[in-house]
Amino acid sequence: MKKLTFALSLGLMTCFAYAEKAPIRLSEGPSNAGRSYSKIYITSNVDSVVIKKILVNRGNCKDAEYRPWKPIRLNFGNTYTRLFTGKSPGVPCNVIEVAVDTNQGVWTFDFNP
């Protein structure tokens, strides 16, 4: 039984050691566009990554940019910013969760207040 427990523990530790690291770093902050807007900053941690889609608060915040969304390629160290607001006019977007769909998978980031 001890051997089985040890083998299982070793296997789990190996899985954690090889867990993938997100190809992007994400942060959020206030916008100079007004209190109703939140700004998302996405920075590449890898040589090249394509951002396909950004989903804020499981779709409860909407994209507030005037230009339509299109996928964007980021090289290592480059940062892309995007504005989001609440779904109703004048309602702010309090960013709690952001899911970013990339060419290297979907990555979810949590912001605990």
Q: What residue ranges belong to the model's regions?
A:
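Elongated, acidic membrane-bridging lipid-handling scaffolds
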Residues: G77, V98-V100
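Hydrophobic h-region of N-terminal signal peptides that target proteins for export
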Residues: L10-A17
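A short, compositionally biased
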Residues: R35-S36, V91-I96
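A short, sequence-level motif marking secondary-structure junctions
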Residues: L55-R58, K87-S88, F111-P113
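Short, surface-exposed binding/anchoring microloops in extracellular/periplasmic proteins
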Residues: A22-N60
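Intrinsically disordered, low-complexity Pro/Gly/Ser/Thr-rich segments with frequent PxxP/GP/PP motifs
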Residues: K62-C93
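Positively charged n-region of N-terminal signal peptides that target proteins for export
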Residues: M1-L4
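Edge beta-strands of extracellular beta-sandwich domains
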Residues: E97, Q104-P113
